[in-house]
Amino acid sequence: MSRIGNNPITVPEGVSIEISDNKIIVKGKLGEIEQEFSDVSVKMNEGVLNVERVSEAKEHKAKHGLYRSLINNMVIGVSEGWTKELELVGVGYRATAQGQKLELALGFSHSVVMSLAQEVKVETVSEKGANPIIKLTSYDKQLVGQVAAKIRSFRKPEPYKGKGIRFVGEQIRRKAGKQA
């Protein structure tokens, strides 16, 4: 069994942490995130954060690792940020970003327009001869992953030609076409 919960979290400079009864607030140069927790205790001393479980019950062991990972993701997010990159594979597939709106041309009769949350920054890269790339950046790992999954769901990669929206580096399982 993994013992991720036992690993201490080192807090980098420029990140401040406030711990109240069952809530932790992490502030950094990129933003501020808060998270409620239960069945664990969080202690801070000398730039190191420790998450300890209240008992050895199975559900407390599970939450121990969960909350340690969530808090670690928050600390990394407010200090460095999280990035997801999506690649548009297909003829005529384009993406343009205007502020907090992302417009996608995905082969439908209409273009797909998606408005993004304030916390997510979007950037599109289109080079001649290469597939367009959408870069999503935020301090909230869960939010950037959720937005990326929503964009990918507009046109999932299909297994025959591989067309669609995929994460950069994602391997698509390809199928052989029918034998004529």
Language-model features, listed with the residues they occupy:
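N-terminal intrinsically disordered, cationic/polar leader segments
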Residues: 2-76, 80-149, 153-180
